Amino acid sequence: AMKGNTKRSVQMTRSGAFGLQHYGTFSWSGDILASWQEMKQQVPSGLNYSLCGIPFWNTDLGGFFYWEFEQDPKNPALQELQTRWMEWGTFMPLMRNHCSSPMVSELYLFGKEGDWAYDAMKKFIRLRYRLLPYIYSNAGAAVQHSNTLMRALVMDYAHDRKAATRNDEYLFGRNLLVKPVTDPMYTWKDDNKRGHLIYPDVKQAAAPVEVYLPEGNDWYDFWTNERLNGGQTLRRPCPIDIMPGYVKAGSNPPGGTDGQESAGKTW
């Protein structure tokens, strides 16, 4: 069916083996449980996949089975998990949420304008569109030069022993260091799987997240533009709409405007 077709096709596939990168495929981690433990395990899973030389990988954002949260998008505990997973998805090769019925994980079901979960997720969806030129250029490098998009720190900082042991943060492309938030800060869940806010205002519960900045170059905080020395461990406060991110000093990642769909981009 593709004979004579000059379009570059892509296919999603659950399974594969060494050499999968030879074909136009995206893989994902299968039907996983919506839980903090599962999310935390997905980070090294994606890095291991990339270390095998397969660059295009993703997860079901938020997980696939929502049994642990009553399958209710209004459950505050689920809203926090979904928000953090969507934030992480902004820095995956493919950003895609998907789940098992009767649960539906569309943004508008988690709230409305002015609600903390809705606003945070919308912020990162828009950021994804602004990052598309950077993502596209790194995807091209993956195809043409056998690179990967999710880069375990050991790939670029093998001389840095601390970096080599980190499996909870990575370089997205060559120039963006990201650290997914994989623990709850704002909610707790009772024995009936119902979530509750720890504080009435989620801004009161912003806890710090430990981030290691590899040595060998300086880094700029993605959100504040503060310049920081490499080779140090930070405790970065993370409000619900912030995920730790750092830009490698001396780089200039291309960006663009947000939009409704990638087809509307002119680059």
Model regions and ranges:
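Catalytic-domain carbohydrate-binding cleft regions of carbohydrate-active enzymes
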Residues: 1-243, 248
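Accessory, solvent-exposed terminal regions and/or long lumenal/extracellular loops of proteins
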Residues: 242-267
